[in-house]
Regions:
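Cytosolic regulatory regions built on CNB/CRP/Popeye-like sensor folds
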Residues: 1-146
Length: 146
């Protein structure tokens, strides 16, 4: 199978260092403006899991109930093109998120997510995040601006 690289987001020289969940929540644009009280409520709900190289995290068409952040390793986001080639949309490295669109709208995944090396991921369940939005309308407003 031939790979086609499309808009690869991995920076030159990016490393696979680890990121703590509090650091990620306080510094990533998706979360940083949520405020300490919301982040302190969310952090205990973040789980850490290990995923082996080549294991499928999700496939195009799966329902998006989780948001992922890479803590260590790297994840390829891709989908088959009409020509049957695997088009790579992004390589997600430590400190970056993936799966946020389907996570927020509860819709279907638009691509596959597969680690290109052994990974450690931080995972937030939609069912844990939505009550924070419901209880804190300003959180929803901030997310809309992102």
């Amino acid at each position: 199978m031939k790979l086609v690289l499309v808009n690869c987001g991995m920076a030159m020289g990016a490393t696979t260092q680890s990121f703590d969940k509090h650091v990620l929540l306080r510094t990533h644009p998706f979360f940083k403006d949520l405020g300490d009280a919301v982040i302190d409520r969310l952090a205990p709900r973040v789980i850490t899991t290990k995923v082996a190289k080549g294991a499928v995290i999700f496939r195009k068409g799966d329902v998006g109930s989780k948001l992922y952040a890479v803590r260590a390793g790297a994840v390829r986001i891709s989908a088959p093109s009409e020509e049957g080639k695997d088009a790579i949309f992004n390589l997600v490295v430590p400190g970056e998120l993936f799966g946020e669109i389907a996570f927020l709208d509860g819709g279907q995944r638009t691509a596959d997510a597969v680690p290109i090396e052994n990974c450690e991921l931080m995972v937030i369940e939609r069912r844990d995040f939505i009550p924070l939005i419901r209880d804190n309308p300003e959180v929803a407003i901030r997310l809309i601006k992102i």
